[in-house]
Amino acid sequence: MSQHILKNTIEDLELVRSKSPLVHNITNYVVMNNTANALLAIGASPIMAHAIEEVEEMVTICSATVINIGTLSEPWIQSMEKAAKKAVSLGKPLVLDPVGAGASNIRNAAIRRILDAGNPTIVRGNASEILSTLSSSGKTKGVDATDSSESAVETGKSLSKVTGGVVVISGATDFILKGTDMAQISNGDALMTKVTGLGCTASALCGAFAAVQKDQFRAATSAMAVMGIAGEMAKSKTASPGSFQVAFLDALYELNADTIKQKLNAK
């Protein structure tokens, strides 16, 4: 286990809880409630706002913005472009979750437009989404990964060079990449794939940690460590997806330094 990542994760979790950062989310209908509750459970303060008339104001008052393209329409894409441009102009953390990248032309176009508006400090997705974000060669099965996280590492490194930011590839092992830096988090549980929106939750947590930790690589690594450990804690209480969702929120709320020390599997 990496003692460096262990120390950082404990410190960054305390920062989130002590500062309770406002995190602006333009996210999808499917996960809004779960995402907001997860942010509250970890100690952050969520704002869920997508109206184009107010996104610039929301970006301005919040400490980070998370853009999630799960349920798209043209007005939403315009809001995302506007929010991305504003976040970059203010030098604030911007997280992009390219949900279902490669599944449709509108998703691919939306990703290009958002990237043109402003490079995110963190991009988080599964292997297929990361592959398709950089090129059209990845194949997407709905919004679930059909590629292993390992298979997307080189593409993730290339995407990091394009954006100048961090790329997180979620999977059985999570890879966090920026330039020549790479961290691996091997926590979590397979039951997490049976609850919709936990990938979206991971992106929101990246936003919360990025809001309080200037080192975006460190912030993303800490967020993914917390995500995986909370998943293991939830699985220890239930073996079914319905109760797992509730147990996961409880785990985020109850997570402490001792549990992180016991469970973290990172390098």
Swiss-Prot record:
It catalyses: 5-(2-hydroxyethyl)-4-methylthiazole + ATP = 4-methyl-5-(2-phosphooxyethyl)-thiazole + ADP + H(+). It holds the Pfam family HK. Its EC number is 2.7.1.50. ATP binds at residues 124, 170. Its cofactor is Mg(2+). InterPro entries: Hyethyz_kinase (IPR000417), Ribokinase-like (IPR029056). Substrate binds at residues 48, 197. GO terms for biological process: thiamine biosynthetic process; thiamine diphosphate biosynthetic process. Belongs to the Thz kinase family. Catalyzes the phosphorylation of the hydroxyl group of 4-methyl-5-beta-hydroxyethylthiazole (THZ). This is Hydroxyethylthiazole kinase. The gene is thiM.
